Amino acid sequence: MIILKKQHDTIIVLDFGSQYNQLIARRIREFGVYSELHPHTITAEEIKAMNPKGIIFSGGPNSVYGEGALHCDEKIFDLGLPIFGICYGMQLMTQQFGGTVERANHREYGKAVLKVENESKLYANLPEEQVVWMSHGDLVTGLPEGFVVDATSESCPIAGMSNEAKNLYGVQFHPEVRHSEHGNDLIKNFVFGVCGCSEGWNMENFIEVELEKIRETVGDKKVLCALSGGVDSSVVAVLIHKAIGDQLTCIFVDHGLLRKGEAEGVMKTFSEGFHMNVIKVDAKERFMNKLKGVEDPEQKRKIIGNEFIYVFDDEASKLEGMDFLAQGTLYTDIVESGTATAQTIKSHHNVGGLPEDMQFKLIEPLNTLFKDEVRVLGSELGIPDEIVWRQPFPGPGLGIRVLGEITEEKLEIVRESDAILREEITKAGLDREIWQYFTALPGMRSVGVMGDERTYDYTVGIRAVTSIDGMTADWARIPWDVLEKISVRIVNEVKHVNRIVYDVTSKPPATIEWE
């Protein structure tokens, strides 16, 4: 994690394993206050040395009374800093100060109506009733001495508590998740009202620190960048090029799993436009041979991840003095792959599947940023809007949008249908409103009628979501007439397709990608 100059107020977030923990730091950064995420094992002395204005305990999947329960250094409570416990964090605080935590009769997951009973600083200027996001299996059933109930819900009699004399606060819900109506306001109240923070952190600070960090890390050595043309790798390439210039060599691997026209566009933009040293590797046949007969999504991800590294290894052996490999790993990549305390959802192409004998040191300058921050960073670096606002695209490419075994025919269906979707979304003026949209091929066939003849062809799925950072997402309400145009065009213009379906599932419970 980047350590910024000490004139910037900082809030420390302790990680107890919640899949939402990075969101807490992200929300605080949105307010112009720097926030760092640290493991729950950090010591009180280490925190004291950082001179933070306050501490937040994240949620987590464990029970405070269960085997393997996660705890923190008890001396943290003696630092005199404001502490805000969220979900598991509140339960841990309760246990620490002698309260009672018990298993709930049933797990509560989803939206709930919160009723504010005591207007502590945390609830200042907030409505008495508000919708919040619950995700817990345990409850605080007995308050610690000196604490009062701040809020309740139908299934949670102690949904919020505080000891304002000691600046200790806890909530059973997740204010960092956007489903909580006034979650941002509540976190703001803690950051500014309780901790007394001032704004002072922005992307200019990040660029200044990261450029210095890259130069210090790399020195006079050389860096290979895995350039795909997507937002993440593009920003990484430009940022590193700004830091070290010609010490950077970009390798663009055409693995045959790219979107329509993407390979040509990448070379034109970066080789000609940004005057970078870009080596194009045609590895279509190599990847397809490795993926032949493979259906399991995790295995596909691992194969694609491994093959990328092997390709870079091959190319690096042709070059002299290549020591570092740059990747566009984001915060969301790391959280979805699981941390030391989080439960793994799925391996990610930027953090999973790397061979143990990899010959490069990794450099990941974006691994503290969320997608929306990367776009801001890209704009600050002077990258054109058409790149900064390009659709998010996973490292495995269309390989995880073809469910099951990958074939050239299936890739062509996804490639052509996706191009139509992107074209129509742009025509409708929705390309900036919808966070991510793409087509996927679930591998199922269905009966249809075309030209008075029976068909038995593929179904194409359309996925479109609205989001801020990719941690949570809602399905996009695309107008029916736009969906109709997309459907008609795909069925008529893409061979072997006779049916279109639209995915109306949010994240959670689903992930954005289908594999």
Curated annotation (Swiss-Prot):
Pfam families from the UniProt entry: GATase, GMP_synt_C, NAD_synthase
Catalytic activity: XMP + L-glutamine + ATP + H2O = GMP + L-glutamate + AMP + diphosphate + 2 H(+)
Alphabetical keyword list: ATP-binding, Glutamine amidotransferase, GMP biosynthesis, Ligase, Nucleotide-binding, Purine biosynthesis
Metabolic or biological pathway, per its Swiss-Prot or TrEMBL entry: Purine metabolism; GMP biosynthesis; GMP from XMP (L-Gln route): step 1/1
Signal sequence coordinates: none
Entry's Gene Ontology cellular component terms: cytosol
Enzyme Commission numbers on file: 6.3.5.2
Listed InterPro entries: Class_I_gatase-like, GATASE, GMP_synth_C, GMP_synth_GATase, GMP_synthase, GMPS_ATP_PPase_dom, NAD/GMP_synthase, Rossmann-like_a/b/a_fold
Transmembrane segments: none
GMPS ATP-PPase domain sequence ranges: 201-390
Domain (Glutamine amidotransferase type-1) ranges: 10-200
Residue positions binding ATP: S228, G229, G230, V231, D232, S233, S234
Domain of life where this protein originates: Bacteria
Location of the active site: C87, H174, E176
GO molecular function, one term: GMP synthase activity
NCBIfam families: guaA_Cterm, guaA_Nterm, PRK00074.1
Assembly, per entry: Homodimer.
The protein's role, per its UniProt record: Catalyzes the synthesis of GMP from XMP.
Protein name as catalogued: GMP synthase [glutamine-hydrolyzing]
Organism of origin: Bacillus thuringiensis subsp. konkukian (strain 97-27)
